[in-house]
């Protein structure tokens, strides 16, 4: 009985911490969703300051991008696909991490991202993992199928 009482007391003591973590995770998920819906889907690049830390880093292959470089890349994507729509399919959070599974689609009507304008419709799924610090997006890792994008744009031959 005594052990059960101690266990119950310990469990009750931990509940506020678990509730706080759950609240932070939900807040972080909402920040990530708002970033995708407002910045990437609607092109409201001024909203970066609302969601991202000033010392943000995007880990992109062989180059870590600063906040300014990440904003420039997002603007370049919007330039190449002016009608781009970005849909959040799924969001999962654990501790200070938020994973977003998304779909982007649009028409490549202007040169951008190193590609000429092709007039073709493009659709791609991707995954982004954010790390949060002090309520802001502090780090990002993103992956998507660039080969599929190039094939849809007619810039790379389809498989034989």
Q: What residue spans do the PLM features occupy?
A:
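Short, low-complexity N-terminal intrinsically disordered segments enriched in polar/charged residues
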Residues: 17-50, 54-55, 156-160
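A solvent-exposed, acidic/Ser-Thr-rich amphipathic alpha-helical stretch
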Residues: 45-98
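Low-complexity, intrinsically disordered terminal/linker segments enriched in charged
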Residues: 139-160
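Exposed beta-sheet edge and beta->alpha loop/turn motif
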Residues: 106-134
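Hydrophobic pocket/interface hotspot
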Residues: 32, 44-49, 56, 70, ...
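N-terminal secretory signal peptides that target proteins for export/translocation
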Residues: 1-2
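Bacterial N-terminal signal peptides
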Residues: 5-16
């Amino acid at each position: 009985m005594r052990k059960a009482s101690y266990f119950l007391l310990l469990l009750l003591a931990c509940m506020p911490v678990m509730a706080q973590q759950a609240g932070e995770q939900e807040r972080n998920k909402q920040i990530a969703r708002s970033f995708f819906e407002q910045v990437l889907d609607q092109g409201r690049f001024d909203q970066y300051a609302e969601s991202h830390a000033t010392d943000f880093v995007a880990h992109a292959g062989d180059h870590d991008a600063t906040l300014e470089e990440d904003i420039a890349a997002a603007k370049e994507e919007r330039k190449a696909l002016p009608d781009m729509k970005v849909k959040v399919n799924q969001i999962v959070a654990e501790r200070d991490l938020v994973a977003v599974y998304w779909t982007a689609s649009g028409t490549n009507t202007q040169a951008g991202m190193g590609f000429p304008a092709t007039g073709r419709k493009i659709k791609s799924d991707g995954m982004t993992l954010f790390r949060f610090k002090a309520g802001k997006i502090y780090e990002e890792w993103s992956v998507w199928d660039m080969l599929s994008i190039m094939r849809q744009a007619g810039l790379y031959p389809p498989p034989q």
